[in-house]
Amino acid sequence: MKFIFTCGGTAGHINPALAVAGRLKELLPDSEFLFLGAEGKMEMELVPREGYQIKPLKITNLSRGKNLKALSHNLATLKNVVVSYREAKAIIRDFQPDAVIGTGGYVCYPVLKAASQLHIPTAVHESNAVPGLTTKMLAKLVDRIMVGFEESRQYYPQPEKVIVTGTPVRGQFAAYTKAQAKRELGLAADEKLVVSVWGSLGAGHMNVIMTELIPLLDGTQGFHLLHGAGKMYYPGVCESLVKTAPDLTGRKVDLREYIFDMPRVMAAADLVLCRAGASTISELTYMGKPVIMVPSPNVTNHHQERNARVLEKAGGAKVLLEGEFDAQSLLKLVRELLADEEKLSSMSAAMGSLAVPDATDKICGIVMDIANQ
């Protein structure tokens, strides 16, 4: 069988596609896979790292601004949609897939629209409780809509198309024990690791907080810190810390632009500091990781805060709102949690209770079903 996946923009859209493709590859070893992504975006780097071919489409997002610059950008985007639709149609005709699957990002629209008009079976996965603009636009075109939450059904005009699957997690997240992961990262089994990661693109405000927090560490804090700054912010974080905390190794700090070995790093983590995107939550619940969440305020309908409050209510997360804490208060909370093994254990159990471990298999079943129609 042949499958086309389309996804892009952030790891939260890319990783679910990689998870499903990886499982399909195990179930159907002779299958062929092709990814379509947005030119110059993160998927063009992450997908080939997993061994898949990806072709770029010239597609850009819509700006919600109302000024002349935003209008000009949106006019260019509309032109790019037409061009990328034609490109996608030609690629689909040439590849002849049995199904086309989208997992989020604006590149999904022209690809799934083209597949639909060519009568190729289509499915889209929406990991957030509230669908994004692209998913809304595709709802009437695709054959199946797979969602992460039961409450999501209400947002779709044809609920009979909607199947609750959970959000898929890559198989690599089951590949490491905590002790093995710590050993490979150069840590002893009893050394604590705090992982700080704020979305695949990074987050400006949280990088400011972390550049203020890191100089407060002197190497005797009782834990190692691994901070992923994100490609956009990494140079600025490095420049700042050269002045305020030049000896990162002595402070037990590992600063990275991007955490490419996320399954290993998360397996080793004793506590995670992060955003509340749906894909991140799926990975954290799958691994049962205690978490301090700072939901992004820059998302539609505050869906990240809603995601985080579910975890908080279950007892697996502490939720802090951006702008309502500083580096010192965050460090104080980190220290308090790491000092309370019983609390960490209960948070871990609560996170694990929310996992949907068979989400990837559910989605693969749906994809194979439509491909065989």
Predicted segments with their positions:
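Glycosyltransferases and closely related glycan-assembly transferases
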Residues: 87-100, 107-123, 136, 140
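Structural loop-to-beta junction motif characteristic of Rossmann-like glycosyltransferase folds
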Residues: 52, 120-121, 270-271, 288-296, ...
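C-terminal alpha-helical cap of glycosyltransferases
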Residues: 356-373
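Active-site-proximal region of nucleotide-activated glycan assembly enzymes
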Residues: 2, 32, 53, 116-179
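Donor-nucleotide binding loops and adjacent catalytic segments primarily
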Residues: 46, 178-183, 187-272, 305-309, ...
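A short, well-ordered alpha-helix in the C-terminal region of glycosyltransferases
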Residues: 343-357
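Acidic donor-binding loop of glycosyltransferase active sites
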Residues: 97-99, 263, 267-281, 289-290
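Conserved nucleotide-sugar phosphate-binding/catalytic loop shared by glycosyltransferases and other
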Residues: 3-10, 30-85, 231-233, 323
